Structure formats: structure tokens, C-alpha cells
């Protein structure tokens, strides 16, 4: 009503559609006139939606970002994160020159040749015992360069882009169902249009408004225009689900597998009734869709059950990750089990095809380590070196363990935009280009290639632009090849072959899509769900669209629109705990406590929901607990006085 705050993740669209220019943003107001700007078409880097944008810049500085009109993707809309979240690249702490740790243990500026030689010495000595953490924000071309660098230069399949909760089951699922499939890959796969036309949609491990706003807009539009039915397996009905007219299928963490198997079975034999029965029947209608998000990887058997449900009901299955680079990283081969194009890393013919294009005799044939295993091996000394690109330690499943591994590993190379927990521990740091400063491709959740050119060109800049990740890896590989002591007998090619974007795309085209046998289906089973005792609850949570993420830094006005961080309990659990709506609730794990105001919510009992990155250093880092594990809950003053941490039971 009148006087109420305007709370929307899409508020910036009112500025763009204002016919007289009376509405402006705090970030752009009085800073430039439209005729002073150069406009460049671009693609948003903040989620897997692949939204078309227009970047307006002047004198080498981005001034504003607008939605571009793309009827097949984002139509003419853009979320506020995509519109205003570009100032992270303008922060004064941007890395502009390489850094090398000196004999006194201090990082100091170095020339590019000095830094490349230092990195080559360290990585060359660790060849065969090095791992790569590529992160989920890379373009397809950069992710491909990391995949090739790991196999050809470092001699390992120990590479993973998943800087988040992950599992072997998820890797198998991606290899079997996602790699090689998509709109621009094999002509198959779901699109925004087919999703909008679906009669029913089931969401599992996925919250559309928070994790893929463009998808949310299509679901909301389909509900309002066509009566589309959306069902969500989640602890509570989110704002996005309610605005899309959705129905909650209440699922405590870990029960998603049971729900999916029940929906796949005959509704009568499965004992479903009410909303569950209606969801099961709706999924059997032609064109129905099951959407799984990256968080389902935290649920043993969840992705396996989703695939079974899709087969049993005839529904289409689609995976929508949270970060912009994850879908492309699958195709690029930045996984321990996959080579580019969806080729299984353990398939001899797949390795031969790839080795021939890469100009090497052979490739590593063992199944590589995933992110968690790479970190563990670095901590124990099994791995002697790490190459880390754009990974935030707090995003990892075990931030404390990751910090210990980074401290313990013998040699650490970081490729980054700005100082981070990784760069402060690195032996060599290379600055790399931000999205506005390079050309590339994001592969969105549809499998649609979203190519873009650099908005900021070298001739427009007053400072030297950092190179793209792929260019840094090319220079590093060539430096390694020129270091005989490091590569003797290793078969490292004299030319890495990726000096520029055209060379990368040419290699990707030569490799094409794998036409051989697909990877085997995941066969993971569900596991017993933790049973909370007195004063305990199962932790649930997801990240909000606007939170403490590093790519949102630099715009105080955007930060001011974040939703308030609250903890959620059911009315029954709140009464058992001795708290009421608005009270401060403390949630304690093995490493510490998070305290937030309570919002009593309709949700399963003995479950506590927290926003994962909206307070402190993030829930995973501050508590040492991850969703699906047990935590202790209580009134803030009582819990703050307690010193005993709970035993964490998976």
C-alpha cells in the first residue's frame, strides 16, 4: 500500500522503463549523461540465467548496466544484482600486477616474467602431484584452459569447478544427464520457452527467485497467464514460491530422496494424498518439468531419485546451478571425471581423441579427485601444489579445513581479481580480467551459448588491463615448457596452443561433442536422516540473491536492499525451544554460533533454516556445520552462555 517500502529484486527495471528519466539510481545519478556513454552488448555474470545486458561506460569505467532485449532469454528484464552488481571490479584493491612471495615470506610486486618463472618452478617440481580448483564463475574458454592445463601441463585429472557442496553422485549425474546436452550442444534440452509452457514444474534443491531470478520471472508469468502449477520440495514456502502461485511439499533436509521416490511411484501405493498426490499426477502430464539445483548434491540419493522420477513420470529433467560458469565448466571438462565435450576421462577412446587435438602422447587415465578430496590431499601432503582460480574459502563445504589445506600445501598459485583468503596464502598471485574487460562465452542453464565481447578495450584505459585466465595459463604453460628441469620426460608440449580467444574456440570446435558411450547413471542410495535430540535441530538453508557475496561489493545502495537475515523455526519447535517470533535465536555448531532474530514459519518441526551467507563469515564458516547436519538451538542469552558444542551427526 501507500507508504510501504518497495521491496523487489527487480526494482531497477522501473528506472529503465521510466519514459521521462525521472527515476534514477544512486550509483549513476549526476555522474554522466547518456550521450557521453559508449554502450556495449554484454552478458550478466551473476547466475546461470545468461541474461542479455548493455554495459554503458566512459573513459574506461563502467557507469551503469541495463537490461538488453532478448525475447528468448530475459525478454527485457534484469534483476537488481545483475543491474547494479558491477562495482566489485572498480574497488581500489583490484590486483594490477603479479605478486611473488619473497624469502622473508612477504608477497611483493613482481614483473610478469618473474612471476611466471616462479610459478613454473613451483608447479614443475610438483607435476603429477598438483590440483586445480577452478571455481564456478569462469567463461567456457577459461574453464577449458584450466581443464587442458591440468591434464597437459600438470599431468592430473585433479580438477574441479565446484567451490560449494558437491558429491561424487553429482559428478556422475552431470556426466550422464547434462554434459553434451542443451540447446546449442545437441539441439535438445529445456529452454525458457518450454519451461514457461510446462503444465507443472517441480523444484528440488532449487529456489528460483534467489538462485535464478530469470527463471522465477518465467514461472510467475506462466502461473499468472496460464495457471502453471509449481511444486517445491523445501523446508518452507519462500516469497518466490508464493509469488509464483506455488505449492510447498514440506521437506526437511535429507527427505528429498524419499519425496522424489514417492512422486515417481503410483500415488496410491506411495501413500500420497493432498498436495503430494496432485504433484505426482501433475508430473505425468505431457511437458511437465523437474528442476534440480546444485543444493540437491548435499542430499545422498537426491539426484539419483530425481532421474528415476523423471523416467517414471515422463517429465523433463533440467539442472540449474547458481553460478554463471558452472554449466560451461561441465562442457569444458573442468571435472575430475570429464574431458571436454562430455568425454569420460576414463574412456580410452575419449582420451585418445582429446590427446590428438591437444598434441600430446597420452592423458592421465585415473579418476581424479573432486574439490573436497583435493583439499584433503593438500592438507595431508599427498598434493604438493594447488592452482586456485576465483574461489572464496567461505563458499567451500568446510572453510576451516580449506584454510588448513591452503596453509599446508607446499606451493600455491592464485589467479584473482582482488585480494582474498587464497591470495594472502599464495606463493604467486596473477591478476586476471573481470568480465567487462574480456571477451568470452557463458553457457547458460539451457545449454545456450552466450557470447560477449569486452566492453572495456585496452585503448580506452588509463591502466593496463589484466589478461584473461586462459592467457595467463598459456604464458605459464609456455614458461614451464622452457624449464627443462621441471618438465624432463613429462611430455609437456612446447606450445600450449591457447594464446587468444580464437585459438581456444577453434580447439573446442575441433573436439566437438562426445558421440561415444555415456557415463554410467548415478546409483547413490538415501541415508538415514539425522534425528534431533532435545535442544537440537537439523540445519537447512540457502543463499539469498543479495547477500555478502564478493561480487556484490562496491555498491552500498544495492547492499541496502538486502532482505533482513532471519532464522526460521516452526511454531512447535519455537515453543519447545522457549523462543517466540522476533526473539534472538542462537544456532551453534562445532566451531561457533550464529545469532539471528527468529521468524516463526510454517515448516517441518526440529528444522532450523538460516540464510547461508548473510551474516558474519557465512554459516558454514561461523558454525562449522552444513545443511543436513545437527546443530544446537536456543535463546540467544542461554546459548551464548553455553560453551559445549554439539556432536555433529550426518
Where are these regions (language model features)?
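A generic structural motif
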Residues: 156-168, 226-236, 314-328, 409-422
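Short alpha-helices
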Residues: 235-236, 242-272, 302-303, 308, ...
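A glycine-rich, hydrophobic/aromatic-adjacent loop/helix-cap motif
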Residues: 289-373
Amino acid at each position: 500500500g501507500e507508504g510501504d517500502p518497495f521491496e523487489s529484486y527487480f526494482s531497477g527495471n522501473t528506472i529503465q522503463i521510466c519514459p521521462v528519466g525521472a527515476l534514477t539510481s544512486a550509483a549513476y545519478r549526476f555522474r554522466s549523461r547518456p550521450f557521453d556513454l559508449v554502450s556495449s552488448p554484454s552478458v550478466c555474470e551473476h547466475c546461470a540465467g545468461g541474461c542479455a545486458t548493455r554495459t554503458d561506460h566512459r573513459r574506461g569505467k563502467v557507469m551503469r548496466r541495463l537490461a538488453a532485449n532478448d525475447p528468448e532469454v530475459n525478454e527485457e528484464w534484469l534483476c537488481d544484482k545483475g543491474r547494479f552488481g558491477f562495482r566489485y571490479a572498480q574497488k581500489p584493491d583490484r590486483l594490477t600486477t603479479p605478486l611473488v612471495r619473497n624469502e622473508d615470506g612477504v608477497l611483493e610486486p613482481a614483473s610478469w616474467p618473474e612471476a611466471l618463472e616462479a610459478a613454473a618452478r613451483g608447479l614443475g617440481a610438483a607435476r603429477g602431484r598438483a590440483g586445480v580448483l577452478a571455481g564456478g564463475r569462469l567463461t567456457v574458454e577459461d574453464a577449458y584452459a584450466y581443464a587442458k592445463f591440468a591434464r597437459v601441463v600438470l599431468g592430473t585429472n585433479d580438477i574441479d569447478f565446484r567451490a560449494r557442496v558437491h558429491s561424487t553422485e553429482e559428478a556422475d549425474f552431470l556426466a550422464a544427464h547434462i554434459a553434451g546436452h542443451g540447446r546449442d550442444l545437441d539441439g535438445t534440452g529445456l529452454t525458457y520457452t518450454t519451461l514457461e509452457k510446462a503444465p507443472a514444474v517441480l523444484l528440488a534443491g532449487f529456489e528460483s527467485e534467489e538462485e535464478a531470478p530469470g527463471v522465477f520471472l518465467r514461472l510467475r508469468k506462466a502461473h499468472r497467464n496460464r495457471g502453471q502449477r509449481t511444486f517445491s520440495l523445501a523446508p518452507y514456502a519462500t516469497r518466490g514460491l508464493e509469488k509464483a502461485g506455488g505449492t510447498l511439499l514440506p521437506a526437511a533436509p535429507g527427505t528429498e530422496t524419499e519425496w522424489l521416490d514417492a512422486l515417481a511411484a503410483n500415488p496410491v501405493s506411495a501413500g500420497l494424498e493432498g498436495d503430494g498426490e496432485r504433484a505426482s499426477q501433475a508430473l505425468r502430464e505431457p511437458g511437465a518439468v523437474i528442476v534440480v539445483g546444485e543444493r540437491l548434491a548435499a542430499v545422498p540419493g537426491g539426484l539419483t531419485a530425481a532421474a528415476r522420477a523423471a523416467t517414471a513420470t515422463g517429465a523433463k529433467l533440467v539442472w540449474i546451478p547458481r553460478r554463471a560458469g558452472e554449466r560451461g565448466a561441465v562442457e569444458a571438462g573442468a571435472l575430475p571425471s570429464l574431458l571436454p565435450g562430455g568425454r569420460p576421462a576414463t574412456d580410452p577412446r575419449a582420451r585418445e581423441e582429446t590427446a590428438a587435438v591437444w598434441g600430446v602422447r597420452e592423458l592421465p587415465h585415473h579418476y581424479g579427485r573432486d574439490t573436497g578430496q583435493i583439499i584433503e590431499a593438500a592438507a595431508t601432503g599427498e598434493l604438493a601444489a594447488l592452482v586456485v582460480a576465483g574461489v572464496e574459502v567461505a563458499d567451500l563445504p568446510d572453510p576451516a579445513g580449506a584454510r588448513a589445506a591452503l596453509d599446508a600445501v607446499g606451493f600455491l598459485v592464485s589467479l584473482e581479481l582482488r585480494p582474498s583468503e587464497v591470495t594472502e596464502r599464495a606463493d604467486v598471485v596473477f591478476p586476471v580480467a573481470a568480465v567487462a574487460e574480456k571477451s568470452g562465452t557463458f553457457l547458460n542453464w539451457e545449454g545456450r551459448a552466450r557470447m560477449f565481447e569486452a566492453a572495456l578495450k585496452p585503448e580506452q584505459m588509463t591502466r593496463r588491463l589484466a589478461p584473461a585466465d586462459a592467457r595467463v595459463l598459456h604464458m605459464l604453460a609456455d614458461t614451464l615448457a622452457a624449464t627443462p628441469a621441471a618438465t624432463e620426460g613429462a611430455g609437456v608440449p612446447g606450445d600450449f596452443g591457447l594464446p587468444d580467444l580464437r585459438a581456444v574456440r577453434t580447439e573446442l570446435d575441433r573436439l566437438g561433442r562426445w558421440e561415444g558411450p555415456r557415463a554410467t547413471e548415478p546409483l547413490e542410495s538415501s541415508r538415514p536422516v539425522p534425528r534431533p535430540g532435545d535442544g537440537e535441530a537439523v540445519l537447512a538453508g540457502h543463499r539469498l540473491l543479495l547477500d555478502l557475496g564478493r561480487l556484490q561489493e562496491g555498491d552500498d545502495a544495492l547492499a541496502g536492499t538486502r532482505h533482513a537475515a532471519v532464522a526460521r523455526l516452526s511454531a512447535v519447535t519455537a515453543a519447545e525451544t522457549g523462543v517466540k517470533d522476533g526473539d534472538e535465536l542462537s544456532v551453534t555448531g562445532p566451531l561457533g554460533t550464529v545469532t539471528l532474530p527468529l521468524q516463526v514459519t510454517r515448516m517441518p518441526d526440529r528444522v532450523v533454516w538460516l540464510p547461508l551467507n548473510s551474516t558474519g563469515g557465512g554459516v558454514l564458516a561461523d558454525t562449522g556445520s552444513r545443511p543436513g547436519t545437527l546443530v544446537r538451538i536456543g535463546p540467544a542469552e542461554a546459548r551464548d552462555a553455553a560453551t559445549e558444542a554439539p556432536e555433529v551427526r550426518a
